[in-house]
Amino acid sequence: MNINNFNSAEKILRYTGKLDYFYNSHKTLIVTELDLTNKCNHRCPGCCGHNENNAELSKEQIQSIARNLKAMENRGVILSGGGEPTCSPHFEYAVNLLKNAGQSLGLNSHGMNLNEGLNEIIAQNMEYFRISLDAGSAAMYEKIHGMKSAHFAKTLQNIENFARTKQRLGSKTSFGVGFLTSAVTQGDMEAFVRLVKERGADFAQFRPFISDRLDIIPKLNELREKYEDANFKIVASYQKYKEMAGLRENAERGYAKCHGMFFSTVISADFKVWACLHFRQSEKHFLGDLREQSLEQIWRGQRIREVYNAIECAKCPILCRNDSFNRVLENLSLGVTNSEFL
């Protein structure tokens, strides 16, 4: 069972060719977050998608994106939002097209829309699949997702159904259920783990709400000791939780530039490209419109450099999507005395 250890700081160093492009050329893209749609049938109060509009990518636009990603030698696509990916009428079409373009696929979903047809598509094509549950009770689910107890029960059943489909097909998809931690949600952590394990997921994953600094490491260690076994793991964005301790003592990020924006990007459901998933629809972070330019033209153009120089990292969410990339790449850029003496 292969489970993502969420060690982005180590992963970026595996892409030596991309790092060479970073210093010498333009084909730096490794991973792209793709919003198939801005439509969603949940009402999460803290949603980063903000329900900006009801835009949806057409089949023709998805074709163009697949070609663009292949031309840029992009490696992975995360289907996320924006909205809920499975709300797109072209979900299956997009999955097949992107796979044929050589992309490894991951899916982040609220999980409520699943049926057997979707389960099979996901189990046969995704490297990983994460359902965002964020609760161990119906009351917490309503608070975080804005949905009723019947929807919570349906999602729990869908988790169990997908686990069965995965087993039946012999799928290698890494299947987990996510939980965002904060002072509000911490009381549901154990109940969440118990529910997820009982329904057959491979792992439970903990991540902090953006800018939340709650230390859950002691609780996490307790839960791992109590619930982990050969078939079920508890994982977390450890690098973020560990770095939070440092941020509580020192507000310095360790970098002033968003180097990570060259390696990780966002294509939104209105066919536009953005420097950061946290700032979809922010003019300051707008890189280009795929109606007017190819992805390669955007990466070779002046605008991406202007955005890079204009972003003030001190004003960004702490421990953002590109934080770990930025720390590593900042260190690569530092002058080192007597570097020849390892």
List the model feature ranges, each with a label:
Residues 48, 81, 109, 179, ...:
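Residue-level recognition of beta-strand->loop/alpha-helix junctions
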Residues 38, 87, 113, 137, ...:
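Short, glycine/acidic-enriched loop or turn micro-motifs at the edges of active sites
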Residues 53-108, 112-124:
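Conserved Radical SAM active-site core
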Residues 1-8, 35, 57-60, 64, ...:
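Radical SAM enzyme [4Fe-4S]-AdoMet core and its adjacent flexible, acidic
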Residues 1-53, 70-71, 246-253, 262-264, ...:
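N-terminal pre-core extensions flanking Radical SAM catalytic domains
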Residues 40, 44-47, 94, 98, ...:
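Hydrophobic packing within well-folded, soluble alpha/beta domains
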Residues 43, 82, 110, 269-270:
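Residue-level recognition of short loop/turn positions
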